[in-house]
A protein has these predicted regions:
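Helix-biased "structured C-terminal domain" signature
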Residues: 1-388
């Protein structure tokens, strides 16, 4: 593993060439004290502000820098093919479009769209995927058939690290979607006993929330894939007016359950600072208005059911390895065992920068429920049906 300070030293010199004009520490804009940083890229073709979080400031600053670099790399994805799925699949391996996250717009296998070639990590063969779920140049018109966003876009010090991060993000988004579709009672039954959390880093983060008078609720949302995933909800105990009650969420996934929970805890703090700063281009004014009554009721009911503490931290599956390659192999085997047939990686690394960046596509997993065009897929619909 490479220390964040080493990563920063290696890649920060490329910041100006990637259009990153500012890298700042915004931790002090909130009282929690969990490090959060921002990288600003004004001419971005997607969002101009990227954020990072971590256990310490170097980790957060490096995280923000790398997220901004991912967006830059995904804006220029190289040459692809403009053809129909029928023609492409007759001569090449192509993903089953029925398994991709749809926007609801009917896909015609005879209509030409742009495709990019990737490599299937499970079948060890080339495989083509729709370009609109790879690139992030949203100044260009999208085909509009599939959910386009940053899900599955990741970077790292090594290709294996980038691939592992991308896969974990996709599994995390799938887990959150499946859990969210389950209904309030089923969700509450996945609550995590905070007292059972014995990892020192997690305890230190929980102490920061406690010192700041911030309530924390946790859920174990690990799915049949078997890679640890958590959701963290935070709310301000100093708020006395119900109409001002705000909840901020974070999620995390990693083979090592402690790292997964650290990611969820730090992301919740990052989300809260996102709303405090208002820096994200994709934040809408409606998100600052009063929360709907139904959301407040759900939050209160969940809080009451939190007392059941049905899941213990040590019971969550974990896999700790010192080698990133082992993490990656474990993730792929878990996906295969869960019935996933393809894990396609498109390498976006540029020789002139040397920063490993990938986009991973896993047909069959749920997408990001926060995406405005998200529609529940098979896994979410199944979870909803089982919870009725």
């Amino acid at each position: 593993m490479v220390a964040p300070s080493e990563t920063m030293a290696r890649f920060r010199s490329f910041a100006s060439r990637m259009g990153i004009t500012r890298l700042g520490n915004i931790t002090g804009l909130d009282r929690i004290g969990i490090p959060v940083a921002v990288a600003v890229r004004p001419n971005s073709r997607s969002v101009s502000a990227s954020q990072g979080k971590g256990l310490d400031l170097p980790q957060a600053m490096t995280s923000a820098l790398m997220e901004a670099s991912e967006g830059f790399h995904a804006e220029e994805v190289g040459e692809g093919r403009h053809t129909s799925h029928r023609v492409l699949a007759a001569n090449c391996n192509a993903v089953d479009t029925h398994l991709l996250c749809s926007t609801g717009q009917a896909f015609d296998i005879d209509v030409p769209i742009y495709w990019l070639e990737g490599f299937d990590l499970l079948r060890q063969e080339p495989c083509w995927v729709p370009a609109e779920i790879v690139h992030t140049d949203y100044t260009q018109p999208l085909d509009g058939y599939f959910l386009a966003g940053s899900n599955g876009l990741a970077s790292g010090n090594h290709l294996a690290e980038a691939l592992s991060s991308a896969i974990c993000e996709l599994i995390e988004r799938d887990a959150v979607a499946v859990w969210s579709a389950s209904g309030i009672r089923a969700r509450a039954q996945r609550s995590l006993d905070i007292a059972s959390v014995n990892d020192p880093d997690c305890r230190a983060l929980l102490a920061k929330y406690d010192d700041a008078d911030i309530a924390v609720r946790l859920w174990n949302v690990t799915t049949d894939i078997g890679i640890a995933a958590f959701v963290c909800d935070i709310s301000d105990l100093s708020v006395r007016e119900p109409r001002q009650l705000r909840h901020f969420h974070g999620a995390g996934c990693h083979p090592d359950r402690a790292i997964a929970l650290v990611r969820a805890l730090t992301e919740a703090a990052q989300t809260r600072l996102t709303y405090i700063t208002g820096m994200r281009d994709d934040l809408l004014p409606v998100e600052y208005e009063e929360p709907p009554t139904a959301d407040i009721v759900d939050a209160l009911l969940d809080a009451l059911r939190q007392e059941s503490k049905s899941h213990l931290f040590h019971a969550v599956p974990t896999f700790a390895a010192d080698d990133l390659g082992e993490d990656l192999r474990h993730e792929l085997e878990c996906l295969r065992s869960a019935g996933i047939s393809r894990v396609v990686a498109v390498d976006l690394t540029r020789p002139d920068f040397g920063i490993p960046v990938v986009r991973v596509v896993i047909p069959g997993l749920e997408g990001d429920i926060k995406h405005p065009n998200y529609l529940p897929g098979v896994r979410a619909r199944r979870a909803a049906a089982l919870s009725r």
